[in-house]
Swiss-Prot record:
Glycosylated residue positions: 129, 213, 286, 294, 407
Keywords: Carbohydrate metabolism, Glycoprotein, Golgi apparatus, Membrane, Signal-anchor, Transferase, Transmembrane, Transmembrane helix
Annotated tissue distribution: Highly expressed in kidney and pituitary gland.
Binding site for 3'-phosphoadenylyl sulfate: 190-196, 250-258
The encoding gene: Chst9
Species of the source: Mus musculus
TM ranges: 6-26
Record's protein name: Carbohydrate sulfotransferase 9
Location relative to the cell: Golgi apparatus membrane
Recorded topology in the membrane: Single-pass type II membrane protein
Any one Gene Ontology molecular-function term assigned to this protein's record: dermatan 4-sulfotransferase activity
Principal subcellular localisation of the protein: Golgi
Amino acid sequence: MKAKQVFFSVLLFGTAGLLLFMYLQAWIEEHHTGKIEKKRDQKGVSVTTGKIQKQITNQNSEVHMPEDLKKKGGDLLNLGSPTRVLRKISHSQRENGAYRSTEAHQGAKIEVFQKPIQMDWPLVTQPLNKSLVQGNKWKKADATQEKRRSFLHEFCKKYGRVNDPKFNLFHIVSRIYVEDKHKILYCEVPKAGCSNWKRILMVLNGLASSAYNISHDTVHYGKHLKTLDSFDLKGVHMRLNTYTKAVFVRDPMERLVSAFRDKFEHPNSYYHPVFGKAIIKKYRPNASAEALNNGSGVKFKEFAYYLLDAHRPVGMDIHWERVSKLCYPCLINYDFVGKFETLGEDANYFLQLIGAPKELTFPNFKDRHSSDERTNAHVVRQYLKDLSTAERQLIYDFYHLDYLMFNYTTPHL
């Protein structure tokens, strides 16, 4: 009898102890997780955006807000707030410059996020040093540049004020390439001459003697260039405030069609299986087994459906992402605004401004598919014919901010 009592007593105390242990463990985990989430919310750098105004004028042109945006009345430059801090992985691992969480990084990089500092947004635009530009050769280019800088500055002053959403500094600068010798920051905009700009940066860095001898794979997969998010916070802050910051843009419709032609009309081991298969599966009724299997043959109309779909089967890509989301012009306040439409003149003028070697000129060759006709307004019209007027309007609305801030003419839809 005593043995039974002892056995039941031990069993009872053991059960009670186990329950107590489980309760304490759950309480500790919940308490600890709460602290972590609270700390996470405190990390990062705060930036700010502003309210929609009704219109903005340049010296010779007026930019009108789309009617639907006037009705919405929200923040024009709504940056959003990512749930995790993102960092770029190797371009050789994924052609579109995918992202991963910085939580996978070790050491000093994590320390950066534990000690946030306040950035003064927007950054102050630096006056261009024109002491190295001689004669009247660049007079027209200089006048054009001043108009663009002034227009973007006025646009951001009216539309780009902020109300304090949190956004991480390292995400904002993740597409900016650094050339320390000539103190240049170049924000990469795919399909706006970025491959040749990377060639120029490699020459300026002393990594190559000529921009004409660097292959496409070396440019994009060689990992020769540093992006601004690879530096610590002090290094990022110093470069943003002292280096010459440049961005080169392109008419949004031309850039979109150029990206489609490059990625979907030619063999591609990444875009066809990753994007093509998902697009065909969702937007092509009765798709063939072959198309579903290899993702080749995406039509522009199907691509447009994907672009405009709030529930895309696969995420956005830098080749057709908006410049406002790639380079954050109203936060970075770029010192030089070049355009693809005047790329040669703009780029060579910029090289003069930064004191590049006299023999270095911007390459004018087509990086890939050289036999294809360049994407221009005529080519764009051929692709837009496949879309209804409403669909064309929706694409314009998608890129409306890029049209507005860089003073591009509204297309005839």
